[in-house]
């Protein structure tokens, strides 16, 4: 199987998501008459605000049904429930639930929370012609629900059947057995009355055996046809199941939605022109209308129109309305400012009067229960909303943990609230760093937010050296529940600037490189010269790193590793003309080639395991990011003992720390105690015990690591341990992970993996410093060396000159 490869930049970044009332100003700010650091005090008070109200529909519930469509009175949901057990006579199941039979059900919930099951609904009857075959199994699911004008329902129901045609003498555990595996996939278009009773049912007239046909989403067009969307096709079916029309799409379909005027809009990317546009379906002609509309590059999921706009969409944490007439989008509000977690938001709907609604909720994996809230957002006069003192906050690409932390703070604090701006909204299709540039420009102009989210691209050391950030050590030392000795000292040391700690960091990851100990030695850390000596032991033509790591990737990685060796924001000193930096340039250019990311395809031959086995690759990347998700078996990959060596560097071990959930406070913040109450959350054991990365608290880390090493074993329905063919207990898998080609099963962390992880953490002292302004200077000038126009020494001098001017201008 072939897979398109990612670009260099993407590859690097991948290495490094009852009622209450909240309000957000129409311009995206809550606004407060209190003077705020980081905001323009003359900014006018908004005329309107958007307020969110929450109705609790489920709490600690076993109901796993998901909302499908909203009406004026409530909403329809679809779930699955166990309805039987098909365990063959005399057969012991291999695992609990192996032969359980499930069927879909439909409920209607009014907005008071009253749930009514559509008792007259009966799943479509299965074709039993193959029911006597070996391993026969059938499953039902409802792919979507729509409400007709008369209140009846249109649903698309899927029936998946599978069995084996293997003769009786072929054993079920043999490889040959699976050559006889057969399956059928059928879709039915059904109309139901309000009780769920069937009005009509028809099998879709489509080649459902093709992988190209599946129901990702469907809507009803003006004629009542069910317009079905898959990622590459649009197919409309009449109520009798016959094909009404099909619209070929040479590209990728992202979303479909009903526009304010009732027509259907289709958001698609044309692969030949790479245009990202909204196309309108002409349901009478069965084609796209001749006019298409330019859409913002981040409008991936359309929301049907109502109120003042033809359609809507959410991008990041912001909600937008889009006008066909002007072909422009207007930001209406931030979900976070309304205390709505957009990561949990589903089935957003806009009514004719402009009221926005949706559902939030989640699954508690410990209690094994579900929660569900109905949220409505309405536009009200700004003065009608109670105001709090505002703390401004800036971030790039607001992840799940940041969003949840801000919402939790705002909901629980009756005096202060955090107003978060996601600067990724300023990125463009041509410049994915525009938001970061804007944020940095504002900060250097004196418009510093009270709280700043820190990631690998944030010029954290520059801000700290300039005195823009608050040292958090005094706050930690004064906090009775926190003790700096509880945290990994090398991680905190890597985050220090001139002895001060300027960010509250909840977690981290380790980026390193691994090689066979017989080749690279058994001691972590090496210089460039030692790297070349090891590479000389490998077969001719062997490359140092994984497939796709060209000179630009290596240059950026090594620069991020040793950035602090070549520049000092505190003194303004630069050392890019040093012999060490010349060696860095030469190291990056060792393969003397650029990788064609646009046309490259990743195959089995290009995996690290295959290339190492064939002597084409000496090292492989090691990314340690969780105590509970250790999938690397490096000894198996190399077929020999390994060393977590790191990248070449002139001193120390070339491992890098990447921060997770890391936040800084402005030194000019007017309400520092309030800001600290937010920041300290990320340093608490209670917060870090649930993170999905390496916690900075050592006690929490050891607890997570110990838990990850506990091996659980599969049991039969009677509670007895199941055994494999060798009579050994079968360990329970913790999940699976893919490298883009192969999929690996993950089990409990082994002692060897735990020791490797502890050693990697202990050896790591350097913070990944992806200072984009400096990286851009270096990569732009290095191009002349890579192309052979200038020597490494000449380019190093040019970089020294430009970087020196820039750094001292920005100090």
Predicted feature locations:
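Periplasmic-binding protein-like
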Residues: 540, 681-710
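Helix-loop-helix "hinge/cap" segment bordering the ligand-binding cleft or interdomain interface
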Residues: 193, 224, 495-602, 667-673, ...
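Conserved N-terminal structural module of periplasmic/extracytoplasmic solute-binding proteins
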Residues: 25-99, 111-113, 145, 159, ...
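Hinge/lid segment of periplasmic solute-binding proteins
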Residues: 457-510, 526-530, 641-648
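Short, solvent-exposed loop/beta-turn-alpha elements that line the ligand-binding surface or hinge
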Residues: 473-486, 564-586, 636, 646-656, ...
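C-terminal motif of bacterial Sec signal peptides marking the signal peptidase cleavage site
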Residues: 20-23
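Extracytoplasmic/periplasmic substrate-binding proteins
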Residues: 586, 590-677, 698
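C-terminal capping/gating helix-and-loop segments adjacent to ligand/active sites or protein-protein/ligand interfaces
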Residues: 725-803
């Amino acid at each position: 199987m072939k897979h398109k490869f990612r670009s260099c930049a993407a590859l690097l970044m991948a290495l490094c998501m009852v009622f209450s009332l909240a309000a957000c100003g129409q311009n995206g700010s809550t606004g407060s008459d209190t003077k705020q650091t980081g905001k323009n005090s003359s900014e006018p008070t908004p005329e309107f605000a958007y307020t969110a109200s929450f109705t609790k529909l489920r709490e600690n519930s076993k109901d796993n049904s998901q909302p499908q469509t909203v009406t004026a009175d409530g909403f329809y949901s679809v779930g699955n429930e166990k309805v039987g057990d098909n365990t063959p006579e005399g057969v012991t199941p291999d695992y609990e639930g192996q032969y359980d039979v499930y069927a879909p059900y439909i409920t209607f919930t009014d907005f008071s929370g009253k749930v009514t099951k559509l008792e007259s609904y009966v799943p479509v009857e299965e074709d039993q012609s193959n029911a006597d075959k070996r391993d026969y199994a059938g499953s039902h699911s409802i792919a979507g629900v729509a409400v007709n004008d008369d209140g009846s329902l249109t649903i698309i129901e899927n029936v998946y059947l599978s069995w084996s045609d293997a003769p009786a003498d072929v054993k079920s555990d043999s490889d040959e057995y699976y050559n006889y595996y057969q399956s059928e996939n059928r879709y039915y278009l059904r109309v139901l009355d309000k009780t769920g009773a069937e009005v009509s049912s028809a099998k879709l007239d489509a080649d459902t055996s093709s992988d190209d046909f599946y129901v990702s989403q469907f809507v009803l067009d003006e004629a009542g046809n069910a317009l079905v969307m898959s990622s590459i096709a649009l197919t409309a079916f009449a109520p009798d199941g016959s094909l009404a029309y099909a619209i070929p799409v040479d590209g990728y379909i992202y979303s479909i939605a009903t526009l304010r005027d009732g027509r259907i809009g289709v958001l698609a990317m044309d692969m030949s022109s790479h245009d990202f546009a909204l196309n309108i379906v002409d349901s009478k002609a069965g084609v796209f209308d001749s006019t298409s509309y330019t859409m913002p590059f981040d409008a991936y999921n359309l929301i049907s129109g109502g109120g003042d706009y033809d359609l809507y969409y959410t991008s990041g944490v912001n909600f937008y309305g889009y006008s066909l007439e002007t072909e422009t989008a207007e930001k209406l509000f931030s979900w976070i400012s309304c205390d709505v977690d957009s990561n949990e938001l589903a089935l957003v709907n806009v009514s004719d009067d402009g009221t926005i609604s949706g559902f939030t909720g989640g699954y508690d994996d410990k209690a094994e229960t579900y929660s569900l809230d109905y949220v409505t957002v309405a536009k009200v006069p700004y003065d009608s909303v109670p105001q709090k003192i505002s703390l401004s906050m800036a971030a790039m690409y607001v992840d799940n943990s940041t969003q949840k932390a801000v919402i939790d703070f705002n909901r629980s604090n009756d005096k202060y609230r955090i107003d978060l701006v996601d600067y990724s909204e300023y990125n463009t299709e041509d410049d994915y760093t525009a938001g970061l540039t804007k944020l940095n420009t504002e900060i250097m102009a004196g418009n510093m937010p009270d709280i700043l989210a820190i990631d690998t691209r944030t010029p954290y050391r520059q801000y700290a050296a300039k005195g823009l950030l608050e040292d958090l050590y005094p706050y930690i030392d004064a906090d009775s529940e926190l003790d700096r000795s509880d945290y990994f000292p090398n991680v905190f040391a890597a985050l220090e600037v001139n002895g001060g700690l300027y960010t509250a960091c909840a977690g981290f990851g380790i980026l390193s490189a691994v090689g066979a100990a017989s080749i690279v030695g058994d001691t972590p850390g090496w210089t460039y010269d030692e790297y070349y000596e090891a590479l000389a032991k490998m077969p001719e033509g062997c490359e140092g790193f994984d497939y796709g790591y060209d000179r630009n990737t290596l240059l950026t990685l090594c620069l991020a590793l040793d950035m602090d060796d070549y520049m000092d924001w505190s003194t303004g000193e630069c050392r890019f003309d040093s012999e060490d930096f010349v060696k860095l340039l030469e190291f990056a250019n060792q393969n003397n080639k650029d990788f064609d990311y646009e046309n490259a395809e990743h195959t089995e031959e290009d995996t690290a395991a295959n290339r190492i086995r064939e002597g084409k690759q000496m090292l492989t990347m090691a990314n340690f990011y969780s105590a509970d998700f250790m999938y690397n078996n490096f000894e198996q990959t190399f077929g020999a003992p390994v060393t977590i060596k790191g990248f070449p560097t002139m001193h120390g071990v070339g491992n890098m720390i990447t921060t997770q959930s890391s936040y800084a406070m402005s030194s000019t913040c007017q309400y520092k105690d309030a800001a600290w109450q937010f920041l300290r959350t990320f340093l608490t054991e209670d917060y870090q015990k649930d993170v999905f990365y390496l916690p900075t608290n050592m006690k929490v880390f050891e607890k997570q690591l110990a838990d990850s090493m506990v091996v659980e074993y599969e049991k039969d329905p009677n509670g007895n341990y199941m055994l494999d063919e060798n009579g050994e207990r079968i360990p329970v898998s913790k999940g699976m992970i893919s490298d883009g080609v192969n999929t690996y099963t993950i089990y409990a962390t082994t002692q060897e993996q735990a020791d490797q992880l502890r050693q990697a953490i202990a050896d790591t002292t350097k913070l990944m410093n992806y200072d984009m302004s400096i990286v851009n200077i270096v990569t732009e000038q290095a191009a002349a060396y890579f192309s052979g126009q200038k020597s490494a020494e000449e380019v190093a001098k040019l970089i020294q000159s430009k970087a020196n001017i820039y750094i001292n201008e920005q100090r």
